């Protein structure tokens, strides 16, 4: 279980059919093999660690339902360690079991923030509620508005700075 509060941006070092190797610092401070780690909103098991890198396995279903199959070496990724019972709950409960992906359809400056519109199919839209929460690439966000074809969220400057959600 995660909170959707991104702890750091990692960098993809290697991509193979069955997994990824990522460079990170903070999320490895107290990590151990077998721990759950959230990469771009996906709960994965840390299978190996070496210095400042860690490896996770990805199965075909994960690569089909998420953006992990599109990653290449050098790409940034949002990272978060699993929630502990004593942690602050700053976002919302994020299981890391991704239902699917949407597509950016519009980006509008809204003061210092960005209003981003997404399109998503009916299989996802039935779960999305205006003023409810959603995790996009693992970041906990509030749904501004929705209709049958999509939804919008606002990205505050701090989220733009600390995550890979910036345009």
Residue ranges and their predicted role:
Residues 1-165:
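Conserved loop->alpha-helix
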């Amino acid at each position: 279980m995660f909170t959707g509060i991104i702890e750091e941006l990692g960098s993809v070092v290697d991509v193979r059919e069955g997994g990824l190797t990522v460079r990170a610092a903070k999320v490895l401070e107290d990590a151990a093999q077998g721990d759950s780690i959230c990469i771009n909103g996906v709960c994965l098991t840390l299978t190996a660690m070496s210095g400042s890198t860690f490896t996770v396995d990805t199965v075909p279903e994960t690569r089909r339902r998420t953006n992990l199959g599109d990653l290449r070496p050098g790409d940034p990724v949002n990272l978060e360690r699993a929630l502990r019972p004593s942690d602050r709950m700053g976002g919302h409960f994020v299981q890391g079991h991704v239902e699917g992906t949407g597509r950016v359809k519009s980006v509008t400056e809204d003061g210092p923030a960005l209003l981003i519109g997404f399109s998503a199919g009916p299989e996802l839209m039935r779960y999305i509620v205006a003023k409810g929460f959603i995790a996009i690439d693992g970041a906990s966000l509030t749904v501004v508005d929705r209709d049958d074809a999509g939804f919008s969220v606002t990205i505050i400057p701090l989220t733009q700075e600390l995550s890979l959600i910036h345009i």
